A protein has these predicted regions:
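Short helix/strand-bridging catalytic loops that position acidic/His residues to coordinate divalent metals
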Residues: 98-101, 132-138, 326
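Sec-dependent N-terminal signal peptides
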Residues: 3-13
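Low-complexity, disordered linker/stalk regions enriched in Pro/Thr/Ser/Gly
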Residues: 242-359
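Hydrophobic/aromatic-rich core segments of domains that either
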Residues: 73, 113-194
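Catalytic cores of secreted or luminal carbohydrate-active enzymes
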Residues: 195-281
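Cleaved targeting-peptide boundary
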Residues: 16-20, 158
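Secondary-structure boundary elements
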Residues: 19-107, 113
Length: 359
C-alpha cells in the first residue's frame, strides 16, 4: 500500500492546515507477464449476456465479489454434470451453456472455460487456472484440474473460484488466490485453509485427495494461459505459453501429471516468471503521479485495465465525472479531497484512489 497525502508550502501554513491521517491506497502492479484479454465489444459477448440474461443473475447486487459468487452458482446450477457417457469434446462456452441443462459428461475444462466467458461478459477480469499436485508417486492425484481466478475490486485481490464444485478456499474468512492456496499447501499442507461452498460460503468437510478440485493439494503446482482471449477468438486457438511462477520450489522440483513430466517442459511452453507481483498484477487499480506546478497540482493517471472505458474523478461531495489521463487542479485551502477510479466497458468501477491536495 502507498500513501498519497500531498501538501506544499507547509512551513508557512502549518497553523492553518489540518493534517488528516495518512491515506492508504491500493498498490499498483503492472501487467508484464500476460498477453491479450477478452474484448467486450466482440458480438459473442453481447449474445452471451442477452441470451442467458446474465444481468438477472446479479440483479440488485453491487458488491463485485458477491456478483462473482452469483454467476459461479448460476453456471454450476445450469450445467448438469454426469459421470458416465462419452466425454464431450467441444469446450466452447456457448455450447456448454446451450447443452449443459440436458446433462452430459462435463468436467472442469468445460466449466472453467464457461465461467471465464460468463465473468468476462459481466466485466470481471478473470483467467483460467491449470493446476495439479505434481507428484510422481503415488499417482492417485497426479492429473490436472481447471478452475478460474478473478480479480475482485472490493477485496482488491485475486480470488480462486471453481464452478465445477461451486466453491473456493478461504483462510480466516478471507478468499484466497491460487498462489495463496499454494503457499498454504507448501507451508503445512493447508491445515488452516477451508473450502467453502455456495452463495452462503458454508465450510465443507475435508475430503480425500482423489476428489479433484475439492482439496487444496490440487494447487501444489499452478500455471495460467498467457493469452486470455479464448472466447473472443473462438474457434481459433489463442496460442501462447503456460505462465509458471518460478520460485525456489519450482526451480528445485518437477511438475508431474499422470506420472509423467508436465508436457510443457520439453515443449518449451512454460513462461517462467520469478517476480510474484507480475503474476499478481492489479487490474483496474490506478497508478497516480502528481507534481506541484505553481498554484496547481498536475495529476497523471495510468493503469492496467482491460476494456477500459474511462477514468473518473470526484471532488469532495460532488458527483463522479470523467477525468482525462492528465489534468490539473488548482491548489486551495482547506485541502482538496479527490477520488479517482477506472471504469470498464461493462460499467464496473475499479478500486478508488484518494488524493488530499493542499498548499
Amino acid at each position: 500500500m502507498k500513501t498519497i497525502l500531498l501538501f506544499a508550502g507547509l512551513a508557512g501554513a502549518l497553523g492553518a492546515v489540518q493534517v488528516e491521517p495518512p491515506v492508504k491506497n491500493p498498490a499498483f502492479r503492472p501487467n508484464t507477464a500476460f498477453g491479450s484479454h477478452e474484448d467486450l465489444r466482440a458480438p459473442r459477448f453481447e449474445e452471451l449476456r442477452v441470451k442467458y440474461r446474465l444481468e438477472e443473475a446479479v440483479k440488485g447486487e453491487t458488491d463485485d465479489f458477491k456478483r462473482v459468487l452469483l454467476l459461479r452458482h448460476w453456471l454450476h446450477a445450469r450445467v448438469v454434470v454426469e459421470k458416465k457417457g462419452p466425454e464431450l469434446p467441444d469446450k466452447d462456452a456457448l455450447s456448454t451453456l446451450e447443452e449443459g441443462p440436458k446433462g452430459g459428461r462435463y468436467h472442469c475444462a468445460h466449466l472453467s472455460v464457461a465461467l471465464n466467458a460468463v465473468l468476462s461478459a459481466m466485466g470481471h477480469v478473470t483467467r483460467i487456472v491449470l493446476s495439479g499436485p505434481g507428484e510422481k508417486e503415488p499417482a492417485r492425484l497426479s492429473g490436472s484440474h481447471g478452475s478460474n481466478e478473478v480479480w475482485c475490486n472490493s477485496l482488491c485481490k485475486w480470488v480462486l473460484v471453481d464452478a465445477e464444485h461451486d466453491s473456493h478456499f478461504e483462510k480466516d474468512g478471507v478468499p484466497l488466490s491460487a498462489l495463496e492456496v499454494r503457499d498454504e499447501v507448501l507451508r503445512d499442507g493447508a491445515k488452516s485453509v477451508a473450502r467453502v461452498r455456495g452463495l452462503d460460503r458454508r465450510p465443507e468437510a475435508r475430503v480425500e485427495d482423489e476428489s479433484w478440485g475439492q482439496t487444496a493439494r490440487t494447487y501444489g503446482w499452478i500455471s495460467w494461459p498467457s493469452e486470455g482471449n479464448r472466447f473472443t477468438r473462438y474457434p481459433e486457438d489463442p496460442g501462447g505459453f503456460q505462465v509458471l511462477y518460478e520460485d525456489e520450489y519450482a526451480r528445485t522440483h518437477t511438475w508431474y501429471r499422470d506420472g509423467r513430466k508436465h508436457w510443457a517442459y520439453d515443449a518449451g511452453r512454460f513462461k517462467r516468471i520469478s517476480e510474484r507481483g507480475a503474476i499478481e498484477w492489479t487490474p483496474n487499480v490506478l497508478d497516480v503521479k502528481t507534481r506541484l506546478q505553481g498554484e496547481e497540482w498536475e495529476v497523471q493517471i495510468a493503469s492496467s485495465t482491460p476494456n477500459l472505458k474511462e477514468y473518473q474523478m470526484k471532488k469532495g461531495d460532488g458527483a463522479w465525472e470523467r477525468a482525462e489521463e492528465k489534468f490539473a487542479i488548482r491548489v486551495k485551502a482547506p485541502p482538496e479531497k479527490v477520488l479517482l477510479r477506472s471504469v470498464n466497458l461493462a460499467g464496473l468501477c475499479g478500486p478508488e484512489q484518494r488524493l488530499v491536495l493542499a498548499r
